[in-house]
Design a protein with these regions (language model features):
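Active-site core segments that coordinate phosphate-bearing ligands/cofactors
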Residues: 4-203
Length: 203
């Protein structure tokens, strides 16, 4: 992207299934009636009980890039129930984000905070879990649909509605921030389980 006649670069990583995983829970296997229920359900469970969902419904994106990968549910026992499956599906987005940041760190990216957006981050439980897994402060904006906002403001910038990038920047307002709360040992254990699930998916 060119801003003020200067090329500006960014690292990008694709997660193929994020909010679409929640749609799958709602539309295909009928475990929920709407996306908002996932927060209540996740809060009602103490742990994932070792259950992981790898939502590779159309392959898996960065950093694995395997179009032949398919979805997997692992760790099921007789104690597993539908609530565990809902929680594990929501958790999967945080784990996939962790994989992206781990990959980006190898290219020298070491962020101190993360700004999130999109409909899924309205879920307070998920936003906190994301912070716990990536071990960084996560900041949520008041306007969740940042992509749509970005299109609008850049159109406004080009047409002269906004006079400067500083003016555009001032439109972004913080709603809430989330800071890591879980122990290092707990985080490592959760990630270890995810890594095993990924390994099984990629066999």
């Amino acid at each position: 992207m060119c801003i003020r006649d200067r090329n500006t670069y960014a690292l990008e990583g694709s997660i193929f299934i994020a909010g679409a995983g929640v749609q799958w829970l709602r539309d295909k296997i009928k475990l929920i009636n709407n996306a908002y229920e996932t927060e209540i359900i996740a809060k009602s469970t103490k742990t994932n009980n070792g259950v992981y969902v790898v939502p590779a419904f159309s392959g898996i994106g960065a950093p694995y890039w395997r179009s032949d990968a398919r979805g997997l549910i692992t760790g099921l026992t007789r104690d597993s129930d539908w609530k565990t499956l809902v929680r594990a599906t929501v958790e999967s987005v945080a784990y996939q984000s962790y994989d992206l940041f781990r990959s980006m760190s190898k290219d020298g990216l070491k962020p101190k905070i993360i700004k999130i957006d999109g409909g899924m981050v309205a879920n307070n439980w998920f936003s906190q879990f994301l912070s716990d897994i990536i071990d960084l402060q996560v900041i949520r904006p008041k306007i969740l649909e940042t992509t749509a906002l970005g299109v609008a403001v850049f159109a406004g910038y080009k047409s002269g509605v906004f006079k400067s990038l500083k003016e555009i920047t001032s439109l972004w307002k913080k709603d809430r921030d989330f800071k890591p709360k879980i122990s290092k040992a707990n985080r490592n254990n959760l990630i270890k389980g995810w890594n095993l699930a990924i390994k099984r998916t990629l066999v």
